[in-house]
Amino acid sequence: MKLGIVIFPSKMIQDKANGLRKRYDPHYALVPPHITLKTPFETQDEQLESIVNELHTIASKTNPFALHVGKVGSFAPVNNVLYFKVEKTPELTFLNEEMHSGFFTQEREYAFVPHLTIGQGLSDAEHADVLGRLRMKDFYYEQPIDRFHLLYQLENGTWTVHETFRLGKGNN
């Protein structure tokens, strides 16, 4: 089974991101807008209970925090991906590090850059055009975060929530 670990922003932020994703992200229908804490990984069904237990432990060691989303960025020239930048708080860094050490040890493909994808798979020309237009707009959103989610991928490629983990002691 294929799993991923994410934070879902508020409906207002998701609506703003989806307004752009409809036009610029071919994965729009597969998963709601999110901040990836751990990229998708394959695991055996028998490991699911251990994964869930470890995520409860990580969540209990992490306090709720404020998520700051703003400005448009890009991973070009590595990838023609457009995103809303997410401020790299100590809590986000801690969550990401915990999900790449100990029980979850696995090689990282990229350094951790918290973001909310709004476009991908664009041609170089389209990417440059859209990035230029979006960088002129002023985006800034802030919201409290008190949970993250373990997702699994269905056979049709869509992602759905398996379990939600509330941050802070005594919440799980």
Curated annotation (Swiss-Prot):
Sequence motif HXTX 1, location on chain: 34-37
Its EC number(s): 3.1.-.-
NCBIfam families xref list: PRK13679.1
Record: active site: 34 (proton donor), 115 (proton acceptor)
Family (UniProt): Belongs to the 2H phosphoesterase superfamily. YjcG family.
Record motif HXTX 2, residues: 115-118
Gene Ontology molecular function: hydrolase activity, acting on ester bonds
PANTHER family in alphabetical order: PHOSPHOESTERASE SAOUHSC_00951-RELATED (PTHR40037:SF1), PHOSPHOESTERASE YJCG-RELATED (PTHR40037)
Identification of the protein by name: Putative phosphoesterase BCE_1348
Keyword field: Hydrolase
Pfam families: 2_5_RNA_ligase2
Species the sequence originates in: Bacillus cereus (strain ATCC 10987 / NRS 248)
InterPro entries noted in UniProt: 2H_phosphoesterase_YjcG-like, Cyclic_Pdiesterase, YjcG
Superkingdom, taxonomy of origin: Bacteria
